């Protein structure tokens, strides 16, 4: 994505000679001060992308194969996997092309590399936006299934889910194209940050409300069976821990990237901010880590999906 700190890796590889950098070391910022820079080796970057790619391909394949999984909830999970797949795949492609250019194996004119870089940036940005949207859509779907259980199947229908999916993809591609075209405008970066914060608040509010309802339900059962009071307390702690992990992973993996964008607007020339900008590739790696974790949280916990996945793997052998 063409923001300060990414250093336009594809274009930079045409005119610069790569130098060996430590995995973790001190680098000088613009004022000559020393700051911590975490370098992500290309091999690790590609490995993370490959793991994410395989995981999400398996999720998409399993959902597509099993008709029992053709429901609105799994439709959103499938699209989340597809978005994460594109995030990982586009970053892997950029890294691979960069390595080939640096090694002299691939020769290309600057104009061609520029166009390729723009295409990859649009794919990466649109898949990031759609991934965030589908995380929000999954939260809304689960909220409706709990608070409007009797009307769920009339509210969340497959045609409506498909229209929502289509709207998310179209909006993601459209806005990502605009963001890439006008990436040097502060308003564009602020829009991205506000969008991330909106998704974070939406997920936090919905999941906290769902946890509160679940605890109330468990408390009601405990009143009928006084001996189960300790079990109710254990349920509350387990639910709070699950919620903390879910939102914590989301914030940990996505937060640094959007902090990076925020600092570009607030303090582009400040020495401390310059140090943070140097870790842009680390922030991308964290997003890919989120693409690895998403299937574990949203997909592989389904017994039906795991059974289908096992059948797919056995048939492939």
UniProtKB/Swiss-Prot annotation:
Q: Membrane-spanning regions, if any?
A: 38-63, 73-93, 119-140, 164-183, 192-211, 241-266, 280-300
Q: Enumerate the GO terms in the molecular function aspect.
A: melanocyte-stimulating hormone receptor activity; ubiquitin protein ligase binding
Positions on the Cytoplasmic side per record topology: 64-72, 141-163, 212-240, 301-317
Q: Which residues are glycosylated?
A: 29
Locations listed in the record: Cell membrane
Please report a single Pfam family linked to this protein.
7tm_1
Record key words, sorted: Cell membrane, G-protein coupled receptor, Glycoprotein, Lipoprotein, Membrane, Palmitate, Receptor, Transducer, Transmembrane, Transmembrane helix
Q: Does the keyword Repeat apply?
A: no
> According to the Swiss-Prot or TrEMBL entry, at which residues is a lipid covalently attached (S-palmitoyl cysteine)?
315
An example GO biological process term is: phospholipase C-activating G protein-coupled receptor signaling pathway
Q: Which Gene3D superfamilies match?
A: Rhodopsin 7-helix transmembrane proteins
Q: Which GO terms describe its cellular component?
A: plasma membrane
Question: Which residues does UniProt call coiled coil?
Answer: none
* Membrane topology per record: Multi-pass membrane protein
Indicate the family of this protein.
Belongs to the G-protein coupled receptor 1 family.
- Role noted for this protein: Receptor for MSH (alpha, beta and gamma) and ACTH. The activity of this receptor is mediated by G proteins which activate adenylate cyclase. Mediates melanogenesis, the production of eumelanin (black/brown) and phaeomelanin (red/yellow), via regulation of cAMP signaling in melanocytes.
> Subunit comment for this entry?
Interacts with MGRN1, but does not undergo MGRN1-mediated ubiquitination; this interaction competes with GNAS-binding and thus inhibits agonist-induced cAMP production. Interacts with OPN3; the interaction results in a decrease in MC1R-mediated cAMP signaling and ultimately a decrease in melanin production in melanocytes.
**What name does UniProt use for this protein?**
Melanocyte-stimulating hormone receptor
Q: What organism is this sequence from?
A: Papio anubis (Olive baboon)
